[in-house]
From Swiss-Prot:
The active site is at 211, 216. Inhibited by ethylenediaminetetraacetic acid (EDTA). Component of the trimeric PUCH (precursor of 21U RNA 5'-end cleavage holoenzyme) complex, that acts as an endoribonuclease processing the 5'-end of precursor Piwi-interacting RNAs (piRNAs). The PUCH complex consists of tofu-1, tofu-2 and either slfl-3 or slfl-4, with tofu-2 exhibiting endoribonuclease activity. PUCH-mediated processing strictly requires a 7-methyl-G cap (m7 G-cap) and an uracil at position three (U3). PUCH also exhibits a strict bias for piRNA precursors with an A or G at position 1. Changing residue 216 to A: Loss of piRNA precursor processing. Loss of mature piRNAs and accumulation of precursor piRNAs. Does not affect interaction with tofu-1. Reduced piRNA precursor accumulation but absence of mature piRNAs. This is Schlafen-like protein 2. Residues 199-400 are annotated as: SLFN-like fold. Residues 1-168 form the B30.2/SPRY domain.
Length: 433
């Protein structure tokens, strides 16, 4: 018999919308927010082969949607890509396409969620009555990198889940395996505690340059011209992170396409360290979005080249010591955390709603992009908006076709990785020297 994992499947508290409440067992959740969907994924993703099942019991009136989603899919299951949902209004949905399916459900109903990876189909049941196949899914969902996780969604409602730790109210039959009993070789486990790929560094930052600068921290400002090219500081006016992702994607893209660099979030243009107000949940939320953004670069940005550190800014008064950037970055930089996306781009992120509702501290975030390997062939990256950026002096410049040609000539290489759109235009150029 195949070995099964001793770990218990549950809802993932580090992969949820901010205001969804998950209980201590990880097997129940509720939302008291009206007219807003809040969701969460489970900790066990399923891939390869097999037939899997879990149950959801609706424990209060309101709207619910249940189903499956990849780590890269939207928590609003059924509206985004790579997610499949069945809702209380009696509709199935994926990628914003809603169709009548099954029956409506409400308080005390038990919904069975079926995933058949052998036939690549998804369907549901209500109180033991199975409905026809709802979706035929792509073969990519059999891959461990795009595997499907149980996912639930609430709007002013509550529910409980049973991944198999308790007897099912409506057993699915011998052919199906409970999610919690899936063989190890078919499970991609994820939770913050298990991966533990991100821990923030807490240090005191004694930055000061003048004794009359009271309770402000300042970075060493005597930067050489070459240092300016590889250094950028960003600070939102209100000290939040709600609009940080869109502009920093340009900087990360530019660093990837040149010689790397360091991006300081929470430092204004005058090099004064103001910090960013963040709660613990906001940290998870922000970095999940940041990772997802980088994975949507073309080609996918190599996360091995990107390191992230977070430092808590603790006021220590004004002192005469000047701490240089090089000293600061002796602190250990941690690998990119593996979290799923919540919000990407220039739109307001839900993170900022917590600023006045949860305990927050001031943090300095450092994103360090290492230089490319000089012995490898040149790769030109587009950010998630499909644009190519490169560092010029202390700013990011959108790169046009002439610049792309020059970038390749500078590297003196013919074989260059390019997105298909750029390659089609580059092909019209004469042969490079």
């Amino acid at each position: 018999m195949a070995d099964t994992s001793p770990r218990e499947s549950k809802l993932n508290k580090q992969d949820q919308d901010l205001h969804l409440e998950i209980d201590e067992t990880g097997l129940a959740c509720k939302s008291e927010v009206k007219k807003r969907w809040l969701g969460a994924r489970g900790t066990a993703g399923l891939y390869g082969n097999g037939k899997y099942y879990y149950e959801v019991t609706i424990t209060s009136k309101g709207l619910c949607r249940v189903g499956w989603a990849t780590l890269g899919g939207s928590l609003n299951i059924g509206k985004g890509l790579d997610s499949f949902g069945y809702g209380g209004t009696g509709m199935k949905s994926t990628h914003k396409k809603f169709d009548d399916y099954g029956l409506p459900f409400t308080l005390n109903d038990v919904i069975g969620c079926y995933l058949d990876l052998d036939s690549r189909t998804i369907w549901w049941s209500k109180n033991g009555e199975q409905f026809p196949a709802a979706f035929s899914i792509d073969v990519k969902y059999k891959n461990s990198n795009t595997c499907l996780f149980p996912a639930v969604l609430c709007q002013n409602s509550s529910l409980s889940v049973n991944f198999g730790s308790q007897p099912f109210k409506f057993p699915p039959g011998n052919q199906f395996t409970a999610v919690s009993d899936a063989p190890n070789e078919n499970v991609n486990w994820w939770s913050y505690e298990e991966q533990n790929s991100f821990e923030h560094v807490v240090v005191k930052l004694p930055f000061a340059v003048e004794e009359d600068v009271h309770n402000e921290f300042r970075m060493h400002t005597k930067l050489m011209l070459t240092e300016l090219k590889r250094t950028q500081c960003k600070q939102d006016k209100d000290g939040s992170i709600r609009r940080t992702l869109q502009p920093i994607s340009k900087t990360i893209c530019a660093f990837l396409n040149t010689d790397g660099g360091r991006l300081f979030l929470g430092v204004n243009d005058d090099k004064v360290i103001k910090g960013i107000s963040m709660s613990k949940n906001m940290i998870y939320h922000f970095f999940g979005s940041l990772r997802h953004m980088c994975e949507n670069f073309k080609p996918c940005s190599p996360l091995c080249r990107i390191k992230v550190s977070i430092l808590e800014v603790i006021p220590v008064g004004v002192i005469k010591v000047k701490l240089r950037k090089a000293d600061l970055l002796k602190e250990e930089a941690h690998d990119f955390p593996k979290l799923a996306c919540h919000s990407v781009g220039g739109s307001f992120c839900d993170c900022f709603l917590e600023i006045n509702k949860a305990p927050t501290k001031q943090y300095l975030l450092i994103i360090q992009v290492s230089p490319p390997n000089p012995n490898s062939r040149t790769t030109i990256f587009q950010n998630e908006e499909g644009l190519v950026y490169r560092r010029r002096m202390a700013s990011n410049k959108c790169v046009y076709l002439d610049d792309l040609r020059r970038m390749m000539n500078e590297k003196n290489q013919v074989f260059v990785d390019l997105p298909d759109e750029a390659r089609a235009e580059i092909d019209s150029f004469s042969k490079f020297d």
